[in-house]
Amino acid sequence: MTMKPAFVALALAILSSTALGAEKASGWGHDWPEGYLAKPLLPDSLSLLPPSPTWGTPRQLMDEALNAEALALEGTARFRLATKDADLDFPAAADNFSCALGVEISADKTPVLYDLMRRTMTDAGHSTKLAKDKYQRKRPFQINGKKTCTPDDEAFLRDNGSYPSGHATIGWTWALILAQISPGKSNAVLERGRSFGDSRVICNVHWQSDVVEGRLLGAAVVAKLHSVAEFKADLATAKTEVTAGQSPSKDCGEETKVLEVWRH
């Protein structure tokens, strides 16, 4: 499974666009929702994050060592889950968190939460722009020449800076929001948010430091979101939806098993 080509192009356009803020992104035959955050409220990734690691430094050497470990997972169940996590198109992207939440996340069952996740994806994606444009860090597959979990996406990814990871930023944004919506499931959804970012290292498309700093940026996005009345109102409604929600219709056993093995 890969991200749909039209969505990849649109996602990269969002990340590289000069039009930042609560605007509706459109193109490739699709209209995607506006985010909650106006441009002045977006976290400044250049101020918040350290410069991307440079070659020969301890940070880069650690990234390379962790990349080598991740490459050994090709063909495993964890690699297959990482391939699923690469898909940022909906409904698949939201459903990746259904098992951890214990509730089916869908346009039909939890419409406000579903839309909230789509809109906050826009906010999280926009927040990475300044650092991505500044550092233009090359991705692991461009350096090591090894395969990724989504080969059809490589042409798009080559032109989009690796640092910080947009997927990790988005996944951690979602995890923090879902933990607030369902405190009783907070450990599970935070673990899923962490594994969502780790999947990018396993896919050979991001370095570990890209993912780590993406999580910090995701936390900054959520902090900013709490200054927006519309977001807080939708968050309250989403809590009601989840409280009354239905268990996921899919079998969560395989995902749970894969992540349990990965943790140990």
Predicted segments with their positions:
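Bacterial N-terminal signal peptides
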Residues: 9-17
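Bacterial N-terminal signal peptides that target proteins for export
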Residues: 1-8
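Interfacial helix-loop-helix junctions of multi-pass membrane proteins
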Residues: 195-226
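Hydrophobic alpha-helical bundle signature of multipass membrane enzymes
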Residues: 23-202, 227-230, 234, 242-245, ...
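Short alpha-helical patches at coil-to-helix transitions and adjacent helical residues
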Residues: 5, 167-172, 211-218
